[in-house]
Amino acid sequence: MYGAVLPGLFFIFISCVVASSNDVKDGGADRGAHSDRGGMWFGPRIGKRSLRMATEDNRQAFFKLLEAADALKYYYDQLPYEMQADEPEARVTKKVIFTPKLGRSLSYEDKMFDNVEFTPRLGRRLADDTPATPADQEMYRPDPEQIDSRTKYFSPRLGRTMNFSPRLGRELAYEMLPSKVRVVRSTNKTQST
């Protein structure tokens, strides 16, 4: 007999304690500067709602969501199950017509510089022996002995060339090095493969 009544009484007791603690807390906040906090008043919390109002609002929102979901399910069930396709005559397809840019042909990549005239930058002058067009550049070729391949990788200042050597002031004489390569074994007990 006590087994069925005891949980009910316990629930009623807990709900009374929670309700009375909310009333005490709300009443103490109205005292302001005369509270137990020693003259400091932080004011009411902005945006804080009471527990009772929040549950009622949540309950109403939950019921509205359930009604909306039920209405969606009702209308969804009314739809036919097969897919509806558009008529092919009603579709409009966009045709892409290729037109090349003015002054360019389809084989533009093959002839990059046919008749390109060189216009120097402002403030620069062309030397008399410098080629003016790419056709003249093919005729003007410096001697391969004059071209040092190392100047491509190292140039001290733009427009100047320098014979770069590994150590300044020294030139390597390759004639003095032996033509055959000498193989030396290591002192470790490793075996060569």
From Swiss-Prot:
Residues with Isoleucine amide modification: I46
Chain intervals for the UniProt region annotation (Disordered): 124-158
Modified residues (Leucine amide): L102, L122, L158, L168
Entry keyword Hydrolase: no
Matching PROSITE patterns: PYROKININ
Pfam families: PBAN
Note: Juvenile hormone seems to allow PBAN release, which then induces pheromone biosynthesis.
Protein name: PBAN-type neuropeptides
